[in-house]
Amino acid sequence: AHLDLAWHQYIPNDVGHDEYLQWAEKIGTQPMYTINLGTGTLLDAIHIAEYTNHSGGTYWSDLRRQYGREQPYGVKTWYLGNEMDGPWQIASWEKDPKGYGVLANETSKAMKWVDGSIETAVCGSSSPFMGHFPQWDLEVLQECYNAVDYVSLHHYHTAAPGNYFQLLGGAAYIEDYIETEAALCDFVQAKMRSPRKLMLSFDEYGAMMRPLQGIEHPGWGPYNLYHSHYRFDPNAAYVRHDPDNMVDNRRREVGDMVPALGSASILLAFLRHADRVKIGCMTSGLGALCATDREHVWRTASYYPFHQLMEYGRGQSLQVAVEGDTFDLPAYAVNDTSQYPAKEGLPYVDAAAAYDEKAGALTLFAINRDPAGDTQIQLDVSAFEGYRFVEHLELCAPDMDARNTWEAPDTIAPAVGQSAKEEQGVVTATLKPLSWNVLRFEK
């Protein structure tokens, strides 16, 4: 066991390296492994890569075999630390982006010498609201651009309780973050005369509603971060990490539809930027897609947009031109650090599309962000000759406090919409207030 300084708890190491990787194999998922570049060293990274991915004949690979794992695990994607710019990190690189970039460069290079098939991700700023963004990222990338494959991004969009425009308009801020980071990468690519184009890994994201603190200390200074993470409380007690208590501590102040639409709006932003966002990880994972009362497990509303995007969001991402009524978002502040600028002209309909030519499938995904009324749409697909309209799937809640339970698991579930009509390559449909919609076409 050891102290987890960040979360002020004891970590008993009940699940170790081998246990985790073997579990990942059993459930059929690919692990994304983060190495320690705070208190850890380059040599530690070499050793863990050798233990994990080298076939045998060396100290570390033979130690793995001695522990009962003959074949290497073949972990493909490795992260060079986590949120290394954050003052909440142990041995943060906040004040030395060049130093972190040099270490990331040398570590990635060495790990790829151990196994040339792996890919690595370097940390960007852990939020677009960090005071040093994007300069910190630029200084990091200038030191490691040719050694890494991804830049890791994190952001949790926050809106005031009950403000659905703030919640669902959050996709615009996510896209600003993506486009800024991609532009930084492309600038460094040009500066380095490099043939390599870096991709983005948005490996922590979420959307939530919580009370806004507002701005207590005007300006973009680091006060709020230091106030939060430089607290030294002599009375704070360490507790044992206990997953069995996590269910009781889960926050579910709102119904199922709010987090479902919030996460879906971010996923649409990812789909629109599929040329650069190659990895996306919902932080809450199973905790968002399902719920439990300890005795039972059931699907939340968030499961359905995620599942439908995974099923139908295949092939090529298409840019969707949306013309119609819009709304404006006034600027607002969550706290001193997270200050959202004003946005103008955001369409009520948030949309993205996928075209799988090989499978003969065309799919439009759309959110009606208007909480007050239906939105009528006309979808022109006449350029896709030979494609026929298949169905309109819609997801909406009887009220925003509704949620699925074990006793009523289908309170919020997809239904086939009855309003859609096709005529000469144009589909008309009605999108209900605060609804998720999938319109499918096949050839």
Tell me the role of every PLM-derived stretch.
Residues A1-T158, G162, E179, D186:
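N-terminal catalytic cores of secreted or lumenal carbohydrate-active enzymes
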Residues T39-L43, G81, D85-Q89, S127-H132, ...:
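Flexible loop/turn segments at secondary-structure boundaries
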Residues N163, L200-D350, A359:
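Aromatic/acidic polysaccharide-binding cleft in carbohydrate-active enzymes
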Residues E385-V427, L431:
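Acidic, Ser/Thr/Pro-rich beta/coil linker or hinge segments at domain junctions
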